[in-house]
C-alpha cells in the first residue's frame, strides 16, 4: 500500500484558487484543493497529513 502524500514545500500561500479538487485530511476534514490543504498542513506544524484524495 503506497502512502499518499502531497508536496507542500511551496506553501503557505496568501490566497488559494477556487478550483475544486477535494482532498481528505487526517483530521477527517475535506479540503477544497491542494492549496487549502497545504496551508492547513503548515498551520498544523506538520501534524496534519493526507488521508486520501477525494472527499472524506
UniProtKB/Swiss-Prot annotation:
Q: Where in the cell is it found?
A: Secreted
Annotated Kazal-like domain residues? 6-56
Known CDD domains for this protein?
A: KAZAL_FS
- SMART domains this protein is in? KAZAL
InterPro entries from the UniProt entry: Bifunctional_prot_inhibitor (IPR051597), Kazal_dom (IPR002350), Kazal_dom_sf (IPR036058), Prot_inh_Kazal-m (IPR001239)
Task: Site Reactive bond 3: give positions.
Answer: 18-19
What's in the GO CC field?
extracellular region
Q: Which GO terms describe its molecular function?
A: serine-type endopeptidase inhibitor activity
Instruction: Give the record's keywords alphabetically.
Output: Disulfide bond, Glycoprotein, Protease inhibitor, Repeat, Secreted, Serine protease inhibitor
Q: Which domain of life is it from?
A: Eukaryota
UniProt main location, coarse: secreted
Q: Name one Pfam family in it.
A: Kazal_1
Sugar-bearing residue positions: 45
What are the annotated disulfide bridges? Answer: 8-38, 16-35, 24-56
Q: Which SUPFAM superfamilies match?
A: Kazal-type serine protease inhibitors (SSF100895)
User: Could you tell me which PANTHER family the record lists for this protein?
Assistant: OVOMUCOID-LIKE-RELATED (PTHR47729:SF1), SERINE PEPTIDASE INHIBITOR, KAZAL TYPE 2, TANDEM DUPLICATE 1-RELATED (PTHR47729)
> What is said about the domains?
Avian ovomucoid consists of three homologous, tandem Kazal family inhibitory domains.
Q: What is this protein called?
A: Ovomucoid
Its source organism is Meleagris ocellata
Q: What is the organism lineage in this UniProt record?
A: Eukaryota, Metazoa, Chordata, Craniata, Vertebrata
Amino acid at each position: 500500500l503506497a502512502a499518499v502524500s502531497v508536496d507542500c514545500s511551496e506553501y503557505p500561500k496568501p490566497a488559494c484558487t477556487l478550483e475544486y479538487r477535494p482532498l481528505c485530511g487526517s483530521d477527517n476534514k475535506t479540503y477544497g484543493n491542494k492549496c487549502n490543504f497545504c496551508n492547513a498542513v503548515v498551520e498544523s506544524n506538520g501534524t496534519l497529513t493526507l488521508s486520501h484524495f477525494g472527499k472524506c
